[in-house]
Amino acid sequence: MASMAAVLSKTPFLSQPLTKSSPNSDLPFAAVSFPSKSLRRRVGSIRAGLIAPDGGKLVELIVEEPKRREKKHEAADLPRVELTAIDLQWMHVLSEGWASPLGGFMRESEFLQTLHFNSLRLDDGSVVNMSVPIVLAIDDEQKARIGESTRVALFNSDGNPVAILSDIEIYKHPKEERIARTWGTTAPGLPYVDEAITNAGNWLIGGDLEVLEPVKYNDGLDRFRLSPAELRKELEKRNADAVFAFQLRNPVHNGHALLMTDTRRRLLEMGYKNPILLLHPLGGFTKADDVPLDWRMKQHEKVLEDGVLDPETTVVSIFPSPMHYAGPTEVQWHAKARINAGANFYIVGRDPAGMGHPVEKRDLYDADHGKKVLSMAPGLERLNILPFRVAAYDKTQGKMAFFDPSRPQDFLFISGTKMRTLAKNNENPPDGFMCPGGWKVLVDYYESLTPAGNGRLPEVVPV
């Protein structure tokens, strides 16, 4: 991964969205139908400079170096709550300000606003988007141990204190309602629900969070885990005047690359001089059949090495959030977090954050609802949403291209399932579907799995 590390060192990161007004209200994406009212709402918010974080400033919750020893001593005398791997990932998210202006695990009022309104109302009356609950569950025994204490210490599975939660509030964990409102179904088999909710405690504890030191995973990828503040600093060094974010949890194929390069071309046509792509793979919990993070990062490296994406205009960084697979509800969180990292444009595709129905043979969400919801979501008015055109393999040109409905017979749609099947069988996709180096990484990954394995490496957690 040395070469991609060099890319990062050469590629400053963008954080506050840089925007410019467009007298013709031209959209910075190719021939996408978009309601004129929504179009005016988005383009009208364009202005110069990196976009400000939600609430006006990043809320970073890491204790300053001189106070860390003292805080660790304090933690030793407080009631203890042990965190799961996913709890630690959410602590990481909170600590760096991805959820700004949230200052800790949610209290009940914040939880209810998130469930019912997908937003939080701030003291000044303004509204910021918040579509997924960031909460910490405890059981009856832990609740009893806490008693009347107003503070608790959070510990990792190794027994080390990692944070202090103060001015706490404990309230009921309405699991069924949480699941129904977040996913739109209570069907069995939802990956995040099975992992983090079903067996969680019946109480939630919220409060003000102090994280005792920066979160590290020691997995060889920490250099890619740039905080919103670090992204902003690097992007400002680059003098980027637009930042367009692309979230993914899958390997990059040439269709993705086409969408990203076409977006940059459109931004240049709008008059921007130095638009920067934030390629931002999700680094938290993912379901069992997704390619693990370390292999995805190897694959992304090859995409840059092979010149599919330009290293000079691409920033690769890891987004630490766990994945819900909650479709239009979750995609709002993905977009909101990128505002805090400085992105003013967000690329959204077909069925973002979606998955197949866990019981029935159909998609869980309408494929178009994600981009439609983003165009209307409360608190996302400052973010320019870029729905992209459908890309498929053009058999006449031997490459990925935008789908032309006038000649559908010329196009081949290669699904994720088909891609995985080809890689597992050590077969090659059509030339032009993915760069050879990137495809080899996928083949190597599937070859590394034992027949008895479940296709997953152990979950990486902070240490």
Curated annotation (Swiss-Prot):
Primary localization class, coarse: plastid
Listed pathway(s): Sulfur metabolism; hydrogen sulfide biosynthesis; sulfite from sulfate: step 1/3
Gene3D superfamilies linked: HUPs, Sulfate adenylyltransferase
Expression induction or repression: Repressed locally and systemically by phloem-translocated glutathione (GSH).
UniProt xrefs under InterPro entries: ATP-Sase_PUA-like_dom, PUA-like_sf, Rossmann-like_a/b/a_fold, Sulfurylase_cat_dom, Sulphate_adenylyltransferase
Similarity comment: Belongs to the sulfate adenylyltransferase family.
Protein name, per record: ATP sulfurylase 1, chloroplastic
Biological source species: Arabidopsis thaliana
Gene: APS1
